[in-house]
Amino acid sequence: MSGGLDVLQMKEEDVLKFLAAGTHLGGTNLDFQMEQYIYKRKSDGIYIINLKRTWEKLLLAARAIVAIENPADVSVISSRNTGQRAVLKFAAATGATPIAGRFTPGTFTNQIQAAFREPRLLVVTDPRADHQPLTEASYVNIPTIALCNTDSPLRYVDIAIPCNNKGAHSVGLMWWMLAREVLRMRGTISREHPWEVMPDLYFYRDPEEIEKEEQAAAEKAVTKEEFQTEWTAPAPEFTAPPQPEVADWSEGVQVPSVPIQQFPTEDWSAQPATEDWSAAPTAQATEWVGTATEWS
């Protein structure tokens, strides 16, 4: 679908992304309708997908999506975990309607249902896993686009994009490529500058792995703080008292004289005696003796 235009040709960095994500690696089984997209077969039985055909079909799918006036009329579906995050990111970037997770039967055919929808275009991640929306789309004449592996059935699929739809990196990269081409054809982003959104945002991540990474990062931060507090704590600043300057060391240092504070003194002999210490105890003794004789 590039039409021989250099602008629409696949770039070298795109090929490197495809190879790094394993998009060209198919399965060991081959559907007879997918033979036209196969380049060769490896010695271990894995079929290699022709990436040139993948790019051409990617451009065709992007043109079909851009042809829909209302972006919300495009439904993107992924029932498998590896494509759910990519579907949500694609919908956020292009304005499509995502259905991540289990597809409720009757969404396209049962008008009584609360989740009833009438999309104009359907994009699925795996024709085998998403067979229910494909079947319902055939009932109501909805054109369909699908990411197809070498063993995927092409029944009810109008535009098949040959790629590896099993790997998490491959699925995320294909949705990222499709979103980028849609935005380029709409004129939202330029082809001269790379898209600032990274393909990593479209990759599926296992929740258990995320928890393990967060725990490891937290433990690493705690140990780093302990190490810094033990070994890299700033030492208290010590300031030495100023030393007196001595020009001649033989003379010695003169110690400054401190004046002695004078306190007023009193003459204890001049004060008169206030009490007679010998008279008072005898009076008390006679009283206590009298009481003692009464008890006896």
Curated annotation (Swiss-Prot):
Residues 267-296 are annotated as: Disordered. InterPro entries: Ribosomal_uS2 (IPR001865), Ribosomal_uS2_C (IPR032281), Ribosomal_uS2_CS (IPR018130), Ribosomal_uS2_euk (IPR027498), Ribosomal_uS2_euk/arc (IPR005707), Ribosomal_uS2_flav_dom_sf (IPR023591), Ribosomal_uS2_vert (IPR027504). Pfam families: 40S_SA_C (PF16122), Ribosomal_S2 (PF00318). [DE]-W-[ST] repeats lie at residues 230-232, 248-250, 267-269, 276-278, 294-296. The record marks 115-116, 133-134 as: Cleavage. GO terms for cellular component: cytosolic small ribosomal subunit; nucleus; plasma membrane. It is found in: Cell membrane; Cytoplasm; Nucleus. The keyword S-adenosyl-L-methionine does not apply. The keyword Acetylation applies. Residues 161-180, 205-229, 243-296 are annotated as: Laminin-binding. Acylated. Acylation may be a prerequisite for conversion of the monomeric 37 kDa laminin receptor precursor (37LRP) to the mature dimeric 67 kDa laminin receptor (67LR), and may provide a mechanism for membrane association. Cleaved by stromelysin-3 (ST3) at the cell surface. Cleavage by stromelysin-3 may be a mechanism to alter cell-extracellular matrix interactions. Keywords: Acetylation, Cell membrane, Cytoplasm, Membrane, Nucleus, Receptor, Repeat, Ribonucleoprotein, Ribosomal protein. One of its GO terms (molecular function) is structural constituent of ribosome. The modification N-acetylserine is found at residue 2. GO terms for biological process: ribosomal small subunit assembly; translation. It comes from the Eukaryota. Belongs to the universal ribosomal protein uS2 family. This protein appears to have acquired a second function as a laminin receptor specifically in the vertebrate lineage. Required for the assembly and/or stability of the 40S ribosomal subunit. Required for the processing of the 20S rRNA-precursor to mature 18S rRNA in a late step of the maturation of 40S ribosomal subunits. Also functions as a cell surface receptor for laminin. Plays a role in cell adhesion to the basement membrane and in the consequent activation of signaling transduction pathways. May play a role in cell fate determination and tissue morphogenesis. Monomer (37LRP) and homodimer (67LR). Component of the small ribosomal subunit. Mature ribosomes consist of a small (40S) and a large (60S) subunit. The 40S subunit contains about 33 different proteins and 1 molecule of RNA (18S). The 60S subunit contains about 49 different proteins and 3 molecules of RNA (28S, 5.8S and 5S). Interacts with RPS21. Interacts with several laminins including at least LAMB1. Interacts with MDK. This is Small ribosomal subunit protein uS2. The lineage of its organism: Eukaryota, Metazoa, Chordata, Craniata, Vertebrata.
